[in-house]
Amino acid sequence: MRDEATRKKRSFSDGHFFKKLKLMSRKKQPVMERSKTTRTRKESTNSAAKSSLSLRRANNGRKTIAKRRVLTDIGSTNEGVAGNSGSNSPAQYSHTPHFSDSIPPLPLELPDIVSIRSSRSHISNKSNKNKHGIDLTFIPRRSLQNSKAGLKKPNTSPQGYFNIPVTIDRASEKVKHTDTKNTFNSSSSENERPVLSILQKDDSQSSSHPAIDSMSAPNNINNNNDIENSSNSLFDTILSIAHSAISHVPKISALNTEIQREFSHSGESHTGSTRHPYFHIHHAQQQHPLSQQQGPLPVSENANQNPNDTVLIHSPSANTAHRSSSFLRHLDYLLSPTSGPASDKHTQVEEGDDEEELSPLSKAFLSPSTQLVPTNTSTTPLSGSLTPNNRNVNANSNSETENDNDRDDRSNVGKVKFQPLKVHEPAISTFGKGNLTLEAVAGSSDIDNTTIDLDENNTNNNPNASSTNLSHISKSNVNNNLGPKELNTSYRNSTYIDMARFENSQSNLSSHRARSKTLPANKALENAVGDEGNSKRNSRYSSYSNDMAFDDADERKFRSMSKKFLNRRSFSPSNLGNKVIPGINLRNSFNKNRNSSSDFFSTNQGQQMPRTSTAGSGNIHAIMGLDSGNDDFKLEGIEYASEKKNSEFHTLFKDCDINPNEKLIVDHSCALSRDILLQGRMYISDAHIGFFSNILGWVSTVFIPFKEIVQIEKKTTAGIFPNGIVIDTLHTKYIFASFMSRDATFDLITDVWNQIILGKKYRNGFGNNDDGTISDSSSAFFDDSDDNDDDGDLDDDDPDINSTDMTSSDDIDADVFNESNDLGKNQKSTNYLLGPNKHSPTTADFKPSNNDHLVIEANINAPLGKVVNLLYGEDVSYYERILKAQKNFEISPIPNNFLTKKIRDYAYTKPLSGSIGPSKTKCLITDTLEHYDLEDYVKVLSITKNPDVPSGNIFSVKTVFLFSWDKNNSTKLTVYNSVDWTGKSWIKSMIEKGTFDGVADTTKIMISEIKKILSDEDSNINSKHQASNNESEEEIINLPTIGPPVHDPTEPDFQKGKDDTVIDEKINIPVPLGTVFSLLYGDDTSYIKKIIENQNNFNVCDIPKFVNNAREITYTKKLNNSFGPKQTKCIVTETIEHMDLNSFFMVKQIVRSPDVPYGSSFSVHTRFFYSWGDHNTTNMKVVTNVVWTGKSMLKGTIEKGSIDGQRSSTKQLVDDLKKIISNASSTKKKSRRRGKTVNKRKSSPSTIKNEKNEENFEDTSTKNSFFSAFSMLQQVNITSVQGIMTIISFFICLIFFFRLLFHSKNTSNIQIITPGTILINGNEYNYVPNFKTLYHVYEDNIIKDARRKDSNKNNIVTDTEGLIWDWLIDRGNGTVQNSVLSNHIKESNNKKVKLVNGVSDHKIQQLVESIKITELQLQEMKELLAQTDNTSATNQLL
């Protein structure tokens, strides 16, 4: 115990000052004395020598290599293994122990770590022996050699007990020795590497000196080992290797005859009874992972001089295991003491081919490629030579001690020194500091490629190895007989190693290691042997086994998958954010490709599979259907972004292997939380979530597949701002913050995620119960989310129920329906009318609270039951019509069982008109039926949540609808509204005001729509009856048609895009769907050509027929813009994208106008949706969008003009269609049939009124021949829009007629007595005469006089003009009057003769006045000229 404590306290560096002084003093002693002294001290303690490791570093710049020395104790028997003593005289080589046939040296498994402490100080003679008599003196600790290569080779010996659970694959189990010869052709491979030397340990009571074990020659010469005991220190080891390399000349020794004969046969292994039962030599080719990159090592010149100087390196055998990055980062686990020995029954032998050996000088500078490499293959005895290309290594055994009797005859102890021939940059430069990662050496040139190629002609089913053909193993020549086997093995780098603990006894070891084989799920276990002889029965297949074959080009990307792997979590800094999967059993060994843009799990075959959730024991049950190859998958209820945004999205993430067909849904501004907040934008597509940030050239990109997401949750930033979203994958957590509308983004991501993961199950209400709630089994997917939205309840309506089935009467025969007209009315009314038709006024039992505001009180002229069932009945089409009238869109399915379940949930998107804030918001509605009595009142509570508005998650809007009876059997509607707050907000008053105003507006729209629906019911019933009566006539309309003539109403599959503009969605064409298709897109193109010409177009080309559902039309369109060209050429491409005459058809039209400004940078995309409407008509919806491919300064103007032009063209299209239909209908003799129909419906008040109007029209037409065409009213359908317009026009014409007829009787008697005096209807008025007044008063008379034939007759206007001149003469200045005129007038007055031609007299008066005025002006001009200075010049000019 004292020695044991001393060993535990001993420093690995062992560089203390006193130790050095002691060593210096001991150097003065002879080597033999020191050896004897050491042996005496070791024998007195009655313990075996302990193995140790020492380290020295050779620092050459950055290439620092840890040079290792392994000091082991090797016992010997009477015919033991000869080892060199490393003494100064050649005589020391005279005594060489022989290999004993009975008790061979036991191989020792050495770790490849630079520092190891043994948990035991010494081993006693009895307590340290297992049941087989093997003394366990040294329990090495399994570790990693470097970051490039771990424990790779299959192991034939049991493993030690260690403190870290690691799964280790064993290539074979304990094998009993037989006389069967196994020939291994180790020279058949072209990629052979230098095989490491084998270290054998001789643990003798007489000598515990470490010695370099050498090959025994046939003459069995024993060489005494006089190497000094280095006391297991680093400094002693350095001195020892220097002493051995410089002072001694290698000598040749040989093995016994039997071994030499084995070597001469190149790999034939003979096992006989003369050998010790515990002597087992392993056969393998030790190849270091770095040897392929470094090439063959140089051979020492003294290689053939002394084979006894061959360093025998004990290589620990290990299974093909992998190491994890966390294992490398925490080497403190590996540096802890080992515990618990393990033993094995048998080992195997390794043989080599070459006969050269390296001298100690060469071995002192071995490269890292010759260092200790774990193996897992059996070996045969070494040959007399060892070359860098083929080094034979003794297999490892965890039993390091032998019997006491064996120790007495063993006097040699081998010391093994590890030194590189060349100095290379270390793979692990910070070994032992806890921060080692595999990524540091991922790109190293030293990575080797592993291949295990089985000879196709010589592949055997050996009971020692069960062949698992997983990759490239030949399947053609597999023999069940034992025979030669050629194996070429090279090992690749592991990415993970897992070490398992073993028990002391062999029985416990077997039970502990007997586990089921873990193989890939997609490969069957081939040629498996299940008996006790199966050497792989006690192994777990991690990533590889020795029977697998892999390509050299394969990269390191696998790790073992033990049961404890997923229970352990790495706490290294790079893995702190990684998600830990629950401890479940997976059948596949998988590894995450870090360099891949999308994370996949790779199976052993190098194939990639998407992750699947697993459950159970050893079986995989896929919870989510991750069929990535389903290209037909399409998201439902999702509005995609514009093509321009989608193009930008593909450009930003072009390096992320994005699918060209992937569509962008929306992008939001947010920030990615890392060391700092990286402000950027989140792009949500139908397959990925992308984030792109570019801050001053620092680009950050994140691309997350939806199929890799395991959890989405909301997060509060800084504890107070609810604007964050956390997205978890299996390996990383992403935190996004600074969302403007966090809840809306969260709902969208969750919706897309659920549809992608659950697929059709989600869309069909996966896991929903009858009440629309999510069941317990399916709610497990959403337990981690704190979103309380009841989106799953939106799909609880039965998809098989058609709302029109209850009201459709298309299957009823027309004649039967006409005969039972009243019965049909009763059947129709029962669909929406429940309760009594008449009732006295009632009052609702409701007392509003202080927060309730009265929104409106209105009266609806309909019974209570009719109004309530119209809003909340089974036919939800009325309510959808009301919501659309309120300008809502993206309306979710509305449950039709509200009156029975008394609760319903639905959602829609409402546009907002606020100057600030969002332009739209999602509304989540929950209606609750609190009271339902159609003879009293009905109360409905509606709760609305608006998550997209500011502070939308802390308030809800409650609206109470009260329906009660009112006067005249009508319905009284009272609406109260309130806002409930669950938190505080700075904009509370603004939200409340906007809420009250919004509810008031929507309620008014609802009431008006209810009245319209009720008023249209009678007309709809009559039109339906008429359609049934005239069905036979409509079938023979002279118009082309295809498809069924009768069908129930349908809805098109329309998803409004972000930049789409709805031109019109309420267009109805009174013909079946097939007729509209034939008119617009059928073979007869004359109709569409005429329509195009009527749309202000000319130079229309010949309209072609559709070829492959596409055609192209060109024409020239007139433009009426104030600037720009006055016409442009239009190139129209029409494509039928969906064709189903039983549902709907959609035609996409792309118009290009190259002649307009920026015409090459945009195109107008218009989609026409045609579906079945009510009464076998066709509904038409037109949606347009301007798609830009370049930039323009006139973008707004062009878009506005394009949309306006499309709107006018659509209107013209509909008008022309209706004209074509009406003209085709008028060619039929429908007047008599329709007249009979009108005569039959005498009970209708409107019909009686129409008949009276017709009688009046006929009486009026007899009085005036102009109205003889009044009989055409019989051909007019009064209930149609055209009939109503005809009647209105008729009444307007009638009013004008009566006005013209009786207008002449109302004229007034006007007479002018004297100038200034007028007589109107006997009343005399004074006025100032002027021409303006005169013509205004006598305008009618002037017009009449102009139309008269006797234009010479005097009228009142000309007569009055003369009187005016007389009035001017009488009151004028007499001096000014012209004598001629005056005499003329006096002469006229004296003669008192009335002038015949008054007009001539007035002209003379005008002429006289004009001459007078001219003379006055000339006189003034003369006076001005006379006043000038230049009088002479003026006179000359005159």
UniProtKB/Swiss-Prot annotation:
Q: List the CDD domains hit by this protein, alphabetically.
A: PH-GRAM_GRAMDC
Give the record's keywords alphabetically: Apoptosis, Endoplasmic reticulum, Glycoprotein, Membrane, Mitochondrion, Phosphoprotein, Transmembrane, Transmembrane helix
| Record membrane topology | Single-pass membrane protein
Principal localization reads mitochondrion
Composition skew (Acidic residues), residue ranges: 783-800
Which stretches face the Lumenal side?
1299-1438
**Glycosylation site positions:** N1306, N1373, N1430
**GO MF annotation, one:** sterol binding
Q: Which Pfam families does this chain map to?
A: GRAM, VASt
Give residue numbers for the modification (Phosphoserine).
S13, S411, S596, S1032
Parts of the chain on the Cytoplasmic side = 1-1277
Location of this chain's protein in the cell: Mitochondrion membrane; Endoplasmic reticulum membrane
GO CC aspect terms: cell periphery; cortical endoplasmic reticulum; cytoplasm; endoplasmic reticulum membrane; endoplasmic reticulum-plasma membrane contact site; mitochondrial membrane; mitochondrion; plasma membrane
The biased composition feature labelled Basic residues covers: 18-29, 1227-1243
Q: Which parts of the sequence belong to the VASt domain? A: 851-1018, 1059-1225
Bias type Basic and acidic residues, positions: 1-17, 30-44
Using the UniProt annotation, give all residue ranges assigned to the region (Disordered). Answer: 1-97, 174-194, 200-219, 285-308, 338-418, 455-485, 505-543, 777-843, 1225-1257
Q: What is the effect of changing G1205 to A/T?
A: Reduces the ability to bind sterol
Residues crossing the lipid bilayer are 1278-1298
Top-level division of the source organism's lineage: Eukaryota
Task: Identify the PANTHER family for this entry.
Answer: GRAM DOMAIN CONTAINING 1B, ISOFORM E, MEMBRANE-ANCHORED LIPID-BINDING PROTEIN LAM4-RELATED
Q: What's the entry's take on its domains? A: The VASt domains bind sterols.
Name under which the protein is recorded: Membrane-anchored lipid-binding protein YSP2
Which species does the entry assign this protein to? Saccharomyces cerevisiae (strain ATCC 204508 / S288c) (Baker's yeast)
